Amino acid sequence: MPRATLPPEARLHRPSEFAAALKGRRLARGAFFILSAAPSSPPPGQAAQARLGMVIAKRYAAHASTRNALKRVIREAFRHCRLELPPQDYVLRLHSKPAPATLTSLKRLARAEVDAHFARVRP
């Protein structure tokens, strides 16, 4: 079984990559996140694979600890299912302000929603 790592090649880095993925199809929308995807455009010499980008705006998650916790949850969920996803560029965007809750309960809710979004995409 291959290792479920998240190398730099599995992440979006350039603003143009984010823009292309955000203009692509919207695959899922939940209480917190919108999942968009576009065909993967890997750098020359690399095979097409699922890549992840995240947009967690300060407008919706004012505290840095909240933003960082959400990003950690998203990365971990993607890391576990990355090899099963079709080779596309995925962007998860926070679209609403989470209700006041403890960080633990927020992470639990976010993980459930992100897992559900990626489950819809798997073949």
Swiss-Prot record:
Gene: rnpA
A GO CC term assigned to this protein in UniProt: ribonuclease P complex
Signal peptide span: none
Function of the molecule: RNaseP catalyzes the removal of the 5'-leader sequence from pre-tRNA to produce the mature 5'-terminus. It can also cleave other RNA substrates such as 4.5S RNA. The protein component plays an auxiliary but essential role in vivo by binding to the 5'-leader sequence and broadening the substrate specificity of the ribozyme.
Natural source organism: Bordetella petrii (strain ATCC BAA-461 / DSM 12804 / CCUG 43448)
Subunit structure: Consists of a catalytic RNA component (M1 or rnpB) and a protein subunit.
Keywords, comma-separated and alphabetical: Endonuclease, Hydrolase, Nuclease, RNA-binding, tRNA processing
Protein's name according to its UniProt entry: Ribonuclease P protein component
Family annotation (PANTHER family): RIBONUCLEASE P PROTEIN COMPONENT
GO molecular function terms listed in the Swiss-Prot or TrEMBL record: 3'-tRNA processing endoribonuclease activity; ribonuclease P activity; tRNA binding
GO biological process, one term: tRNA 5'-leader removal
EC class name: hydrolase
Keyword Lipid biosynthesis on entry: no
Highest taxon, organism lineage: Bacteria
